Design a protein with these regions (language model features):
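Conserved alpha-helical substructure of the radical SAM core
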Residues: 123-153
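Short beta->alpha linker loops
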Residues: 131, 195, 218, 325-329
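P-loop NTP-binding catalytic core
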Residues: 88-97, 101-102
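Conserved AdoMet/S-adenosylmethionine-binding subsite of the radical SAM
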Residues: 144-153, 158-316, 320
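Auxiliary Fe-S-binding modules of radical SAM enzymes
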Residues: 1-92, 244-253, 258-347
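Generic beta-strand structural signal
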Residues: 80, 92, 103-107, 115, ...
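Glutamine-centric residue-chemistry signal
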Residues: 31, 110, 136-139, 306
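Canonical Radical SAM [4Fe-4S] cluster-binding loop centered on the CxxxCxxC motif
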Residues: 98-135
Length: 347
């Protein structure tokens, strides 16, 4: 917002420096920080903050808010899909899912996506900008407040490519896991990437403890390049080498996401080739029946084909499961609600 400071994207140390450099006592920073994580979105409602500090904050800063533009609730499994808008009117999607172990949220990291995967609805809406850490936090906080729940797991698998917004995503991870913030542990966070190889190495060096989920979607470069433009820059061999480094460096097993597209990547030969690729990697394959996206012509593999694929992988000691489909009646897959919003004249 113009030249105002995005105060919710600050760590406590950064906020402390910001406050003291402008002539206010150090302890005021912790008071402000506490209010921010009590979902206060107006400086005037920070009751123990003096008037002169409130005036300074209002003239120098803003509090990012994720507002609910649309909300869909599945009648089958209570999955909730949100379209959130931010201070500049841009919108992203998030999905809250209920499991036995608690609530998980799938959040967006960018408005749109540059990656252009042919089976994904998000890329068809173009790319606007990356999200700030505060805007990623806002998706979680607004959902928790709206549903009166506590989110226990986070998946960065919504709109956008997290590793294309590397610095902001890393800062978000530190903020959301902080004892002073939402206090959601790193081991309860999964980051999904289409495979920006240099950033995987960079992420490994940070030893954050998050789970890395790689969108593989093909057993060879020929198929992957047809469906995922990023594959023209980084080969599967390069990608798997980076994943191996991630496992060796962090001790965290990598999960490979594999969208099953009928007649494209779901044959017995595809399964055997994938098994050979992943042999000895100690990884897990998450099979995803591809979502129907208008204009792609792609169809999901049938249940029999999915099971045959799993059996071939299992015979080579490659663990695989079919991802449970939630929110099927509300198009809970990423990008579809935003696309409809744009068609109706929104941002």
């Amino acid at each position: 917002m113009n030249n105002l400071t995005d105060i919710k994207s600050m760590t406590l140390d950064e906020l402390t420096e910001f406050v003291t450099e402008n002539g206010f006592p150090k302890f005021r920073a912790k008071q402000i920080y506490d209010w921010l994580y009590k979902n206060v979105t107006d400086f005037d409602n920070m009751r123990n903050i003096p008037a002169d500090l409130k005036a300074f904050l209002k003239s120098s800063s803003y509090i990012s808010v994720a507002n609910i533009e649309k909300k869909l609730v599945s009648r089958y499994d209570k999955t909730v899909k949100y379209l959130f808008s931010f201070n500049d009117g841009e919108c992203v999607e998030s999905v809250v899912m209920s499991y036995k172990h608690g609530y998980s949220i799938c959040i967006s990291t960018q408005v749109g996506c540059k990656m252009g995967c042919t089976f994904c609805a998000t890329g068809k809406s173009g790319f606007s900008r990356s999200l700030a850490p505060s805007e990623m936090l806002g998706q979680i906080e607004t959902a928790q407040r709206d549903l009166n729940i506590r989110i226990s797991n986070i998946v960065l698998m919504g709109m956008g490519e997290p590793l294309d917004n590397f610095d902001n995503v890393v800062k978000f991870l530190r903020l959301v896991s902080s004892d002073n913030g939402l206090n959601i542990g790193m081991r309860h966070i999964t980051l999904s990437t289409c495979g920006i190889v240099p950033k995987i190495y960079e992420l490994a060096k940070l030893h954050l403890g998050i789970t890395l989920s790689v969108l593989l979607h093909a057993p060879n470069d020929e198929i992957r390049q047809r469906t995922m433009p990023i594959a023209r820059k980084y080969s599967i061999e390069e990608l798997l080498k980076a994943c191996s480094d991630y496992f060796k460096t962090t001790g965290r097993r990598v999960t490979f996401e594999y969208s099953m597209i009928s007649g494209v990547n779901d044959s017995d030969e595809n399964a055997r080739e994938l098994a050979k690729r992943l042999e000895g990697t100690q990884s897990h394959v998450n099979l995803i029946p591809v979502n129907t996206v208008e204009g792609t012509g792609y169809l999901k593999s049938n249940i029999k084909r999915q099971q045959t694929f799993i059996n071939i992988l299992a015979a080579k000691n490659i663990g695989a499961t079919v991802r449970r489909t939630l929110g099927s009646d509300i198009n809970a897959s990423c990008g579809q609600l935003k696309r409809k919003h744009i068609e109706e004249g929104g941002k």
